[in-house]
Amino acid sequence: MTKKVYIKTFGCQMNEYDSDKMVDVLNAAEGLEKTDTPEDADIILFNTCSVREKAQEKVFSDLGRVRELKEAKPGLLIGVGGCVASQEGASIVSRAPYVDLVFGPQTLHRLPQMIDQRRASGRAQVDISFPEIEKFDHLPPARVEGPSAFVSIMEGCSKYCSYCVVPYTRGDEVSRPLDDVLTEVAGLADQGVREVTLLGQNVNAYRGALTAGSTEIADFATLIEYVADIPGIERIRYTTSHPKEFTQRLIDTYAKVPKLVSHLHLPVQHGSDRILMAMKRGYTVLEYKSVIRKLRAIRPDLSLSTDMIVGFPGETEEDFDKMMALVHEMSYDTSFSFIYSPRPGTPAANLHDDTPREVKLKRLQHLQATIEENVARISRSMVGKVERILVEGPSRKDPNELSGRTENNRVVNFPAPLASHPRLIGQMIDVKINHAYPHSLRGELLLVSDDASAATH
């Protein structure tokens, strides 16, 4: 009987990518297949996030729930990976003695060896070291399902923002060699991938050697240009970028590379220079707006999303008003916004914070309501327009329909004959948008290409 692994992923796209790699590693070493049901699993892994306190506590809550599964199935192995594992280390085993494996983002490739050692010794295995970027040398070729895929191009962060634990849990920035990244992307294209999302904690800080051991360095703009030349790749996205690393060369890439989508996630975190300085972000609001102005001069239709933190220690009503002014000026399409959560070991955790919780919550609700208004307005403006989408698969709401994404990352559901589904999935097609809903769009297929036309017959 095939053994199975269940993985629950918390947090960012980097963690989603790492979870996929865990499956690849365990499949190559032990023949394990992924399951969506923890009760069916022989190994249960939690790939964790420590950016916010609630996410961290939820891990231990979930661990408590799978404890019963282990009691009923003694051979079951339970592991904790990701940033909480890096931060807490062996204390996870002290708090939850039934945990067998604790590993960091940089040591997931060692899972098979850790499992062997756990079975041989009967003792929990902990490995949260930072072995540079070694893991990419030990990962099997990616296995993908669907036309979109993530590709990690670098690890870690060297910015050390005052509120953030990532540099402590993932280490400093280390970039993969250019040829290593291109080999992975080409392999994905051979499997039918049409859209890649390049990943990094500060993805535009990429500085990769041309080849392993080479002294010649490729910047992020160069990497994008090379990825665009790979046959089969039709769309390029990336996340998460940092305003401080947004070079003129990268801005110019938007004019030179049509495959680079007109959608950018560029976290600003706040709209007050005083708060940005306290956060140690390394730029001013004016410098941030200058980047967006230059980009929109090249791509007037650029869709912009961001991250924002409300209630950072010392935030005044005036500071918050400046944040809201920036929101209105930038016309953000989406924002991942949260109330500040102090993380142990970060400089900001020691800052005096006298803003009442109810005030922070009121500010967050106002921010999110404004962003939602922006989202609805932008969605309504798309009605009647023709949008190019990548068909990803059957619609979640109605399997008789298909679903895809626009350049600005909107989900579009549209009817199509069932017989055409296999050929349309993975294709770039044109749809006319007919309706805008709170979290999706609805459209109709337009036969504008030979591929799409052939797919409907």
Swiss-Prot record:
Binding site for [4Fe-4S] cluster 1: 12, 49, 83
Subcellular location: Cytoplasm
Domain named MTTase N-terminal: residues: 3-120
Catalytic activity: N(6)-dimethylallyladenosine(37) in tRNA + (sulfur carrier)-SH + AH2 + 2 S-adenosyl-L-methionine = 2-methylsulfanyl-N(6)-dimethylallyladenosine(37) in tRNA + (sulfur carrier)-H + 5'-deoxyadenosine + L-methionine + A + S-adenosyl-L-homocysteine + 2 H(+)
Cofactors required: [4Fe-4S] cluster
Domain Radical SAM core per the UniProt entry, residue ranges: 143-377
Keywords recorded for this protein, A-Z: 4Fe-4S, Cytoplasm, Iron, Iron-sulfur, Metal-binding, S-adenosyl-L-methionine, Transferase, tRNA processing
Molecular function GO labels: 4 iron, 4 sulfur cluster binding; metal ion binding; N6-isopentenyladenosine methylthiotransferase activity
Domain TRAM: 380-447
Residues that bind [4Fe-4S] cluster 2: 157, 161, 164
Family under the similarity heading: Belongs to the methylthiotransferase family. MiaB subfamily.
Entries under NCBIfam families matching the protein: miaB-methiolase, MiaB/RimO family radical SAM methylthiotransferase
Function summary: Catalyzes the methylthiolation of N6-(dimethylallyl)adenosine (i(6)A), leading to the formation of 2-methylthio-N6-(dimethylallyl)adenosine (ms(2)i(6)A) at position 37 in tRNAs that read codons beginning with uridine.
Protein name: tRNA-2-methylthio-N(6)-dimethylallyladenosine synthase
Species in which this protein is naturally found: Burkholderia ambifaria (strain MC40-6)
Gene designation per UniProt: miaB
